[in-house]
Amino acid sequence: MPKPINVRVTTMDAELEFAIQPNTTGKQLFDQVVKTVGLREVWFFGLQYVDSKGYSTWLKLNKKVTQQDVRKENPLQFKFRAKFFPEDVSEELIQEITQRLFFLQVKEAILNDEIYCPPETAVLLASYAVQSKYGDYNKEIHKLGYLANDRLLPQRVLEQHKLTKEQWEERIQNWHEEHRGMLREDSMMEYLKIAQDLEMYGVNYFEIKNKKGTELWLGVDALGLNIYEHDDKLTPKIGFPWSEIRNISFNDKKFVIKPIDKKAPDFVFYAPRLRINKRILALCMGNHELYMRRRKPDTIEVQQMKAQAREEKHQKQLERAQLENEKKKREIAEKEKERIEREKEELMERLRQIEEQTMKAQKELEEQTRRALELDQERKRAKEEAERLEKERRAAEEAKAALAKQAADQMKNQEQLAAELAEFTAKIALLEEAKKKKEEEASEWQHKAFAAQEDLEKTKEELKSVMSAPPPPPPPPVIPPTENEHDEHDENNAEASAELSSDGVMNHRSEEERVTETQKNERVKKQLQALSSELAQARDETKKTQNDVLHAENVKAGRGKYKTLRQIRQGNTKQRIDEFEAM
C-alpha cells in the first residue's frame, strides 16, 4: 500500500492537517478542506502553494497533488485563500464562515499595505475590527490600553503620524463606541463594505508591455480588465468590462483579447513569462464566469443558502433581542434592588433621627420638669416671705397703734415717743416697699411657673405623638469556477484560448452605477473628512508614499473608484484599444 503524504492547510484562522494518497487530486484535497471548515461558497476560494522556484501558485484541481510543482516539505504546505473577489460583499457573501474568511484576508492585506488604505479610513476599519473582536464598548471592561496588543493599523500609517499609541486608541475607541448594538458578524460585513471601495481591493496586478514596449500594469478583478501606468496602481487609465470580451488567448508571452465589437482590433499585450499568461488566463476565466453568474438568476443552491442564511441571521437577532431583554430586566431588577436598599438606608437613618429626637425630647422634658419644680419652690418661698412680711407689717401697725395710744396717754414723754414713732413710721415704709417687691417677685415666679407648665404639657404632647407614630413600612421584597486550467509549469503548452460567453445576461454594466459606501452615509463621510483634517495636523509630510500622493490627488479631483470606472470605459472598444497602444 502506498505511503500517505502529510499535508498542512492554513486557513485565515486555523491550521488543518490531512494525510492524502499519492493519487489524490487537487479537487479531492480542496473538497476535504471546505468540508472540514463547513464552507459552501467554494467558487471564491483556492489552495495556494509555493513552488520549487519560490513563486506563489494556485493548486490545479484537475491534477494530482503529487504531479504539481509543490515545494518538497513534510508536511506539504498550502494556504486556503480567496482567489476571486465579489463585486458587492453584502449581496454575494452568504455564509458567516465565508464572510469571516474574507474579512480576515482583506484585513491582513490592508495591514500589510498590499491594499492601500488612507489613514482616516484605516481608523474606521480598525473600529469595526475591534467591534468584531470585543463586541460593544464597555468603559468598565475596556480600560485605557485595551487595544495595546492588537495590530489594527498599517505600519505606514503609524510611522507617518506623530501620535502615541494612546492617541490612536482614543480615535479608534470613539468610533468603537458608535457601533453599540452591532453584531460581531455585522461589523465584519461593514468592514468589507468599506474595504471593497478601496482602489486596490480584489485586484490582481501583472506587469505587461504594449506593442510600443511601454511598461504597464494589467489589473484583473471582478469587474473586468484595467490598464494602469507603471507608477500608479491606484488609478486605472483604460478599462474593459467582462461583457465586452469575447475570447482570450495567449501564445508564449503574447496575450490576445478579442472584443465582442467586431470592428475593434484585438487587444494585445506581452507578459514577461509564459507562466504569467497562464495565470492571467485562469483568472480571466474565473472572474468572467462569476461576473456572468451574478447577472443571471440565482441557482437553486444559492437560493437555498441565502434562505438558510436569512433564517440563521433572524434566529441570531431573536436570540440577541432576548439576551438584550434579559439584560435589561436584570439591570431593572438591580436598579430596583439598589433603590430598595437606598430607601431602606434612608428609613434606617430616619428611624435613627427619630430616636435621637425622642431622646432629646425626653431630656428636654426632664429638664423642663426639673425647672418647673424649681420655679414652684421659688414661688412657695416668695409666698412664705410675703406672708412673713405681712405678719411683720401687721405687728408694726399694732405697735404703732399701741404707741399712739401710749403717746396719748403719756404726753409727758412726748419727744421720746415722737422719735420712736418716726422710727416705726420709717420702718413701716421700708417694710411696705419690701413687701411690694416680694409681691411683684412672687407674681413673676407665678408667670414663669405657668409658662413652664405649658412647655411641659406641649413636650408631653410631642413625645406622645412621636411614640404613637406607626413604624416605617418594611422594604418591599427584591424581585430578583469550472476550471479550464493550464499548468503554469508546463513550458511545452505555450498557447491556450478560452471563449467568454455573455449569453442570457441582462444589465451587463450595472457596476458603473455604484457609489461608495461612505457616499451613501453622509454622517460617516463628514466624520472621515474631520478625522482626515485632524490627522493632517500630526502627519510627517516627509514620510508620504507615492500612493499617499496619488490618493490625495484623486480626492482633490473628486475621483472615486466607481467614478473612475465610468470614465475609463467611455468611448467604444476601438477607441480604448487605440488609447492603450498609444500609452
Curated annotation (Swiss-Prot):
GO cellular component terms listed in the entry, alphabetical order: adherens junction; apical part of cell; cytoplasm; cytoskeleton; filopodium; microvillus; plasma membrane
A family per Pfam: ERM_C
Domain of life the protein comes from: Eukaryota
InterPro entries: Band_41_domain, ERM, ERM_C_dom, ERM_FERM_C, ERM_helical, Ez/rad/moesin-like, FERM/acyl-CoA-bd_prot_sf, FERM_2
Gene Ontology BP terms: actin filament capping; positive regulation of early endosome to late endosome transport; positive regulation of protein localization to early endosome; regulation of cell shape; regulation of organelle assembly
CDD domains: FERM_B-lobe, FERM_C_ERM, FERM_F1_ERM
Domain FERM: 5-295
Functional note: Probably plays a crucial role in the binding of the barbed end of actin filaments to the plasma membrane.
Annotated protein name in UniProt: Radixin
Organism of origin: Gallus gallus
Lineage of origin: Eukaryota, Metazoa, Chordata, Craniata, Vertebrata
